[in-house]
Amino acid sequence: MSVKPNALVTGATSGIGEATADRLQAAGYRVFAIGRNPEALQALSLRGLTAHALDVTDEAAVEQLVDEIDGGVDVLVNCAGFPLTCPLEQVALSDLRLLFETNIVAALHLSQAVLPGMRERGSGVIVNIGSTGGRFASPGAGGYHVVKYGMEALSLSLRAEVAPFGVRVVLLDPTAVRTPFVTSQQEAQPVYAPDDPYGDFKRRYADYTRRLSAKRGVMIEPDTVARAVLRVVRAKNPRPRYIVGRSGKATVFARALVTDRMWDRILMRGLHD
């Protein structure tokens, strides 16, 4: 009887992480699903996944979990994160720090925790979930872009460093994904203070985002990303990074064709008219 390979998935209680955990389990992996929502974790357990309540920013807890996984981690998928939309002048630094700790520092620490075992075995895959928001920047979500640009650098640097040990690091950059968190943000009807200097901009940004998301083909489902994760995990020689979603590919391609000044005008025309 063959031993199932181990996969560790963060942010597994919803969205991309949950879909990825399910896909990997169906593909024959023993999946350790990490999250913080008790009800969602219980549901994962009922589906046969090994669910753990864990804050990825808790370094001691992360190291303890990795040490307890019999046979080591063969596949690590870093999915934990959350959106952050706010003009940069008004963004709460505590929110930005938390996003950076959750998305970048935790991803690096988890990689550090699993790499010794991967190096010893001479194999392993680390998949980082980035965003097309790491390929270009736009107003209204500057803090999110800052962190996603960081994920690009983390993944590409780490990939080159660990490749000689037989470890593959791959970055997936999805376009907008229809997750419960994103949907709730789009459906919200916030009220802005009359003296908010960014009030008009925020209303335009929210309206623009809703209209764009309603267009066919703009947003993708979490399972689309999960299927991409499974493909790169199975690939013998995956590329350093992939864009997931046609709309994301089109936007990144268009950005590459125009100058910085032209891109600047496009963004301001879309959100300030």
Name every feature range the model reports, one short phrase each.
Residues L54-Q64, L93:
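The beta1-alpha1 cofactor-binding region of Rossmann-like NAD(H)/NADP(H)-dependent oxidoreductases
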Residues P164-K215:
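C-terminal beta-strand-loop-alpha-helix "lid" module of Rossmann-like NAD(P)-dependent dehydrogenases
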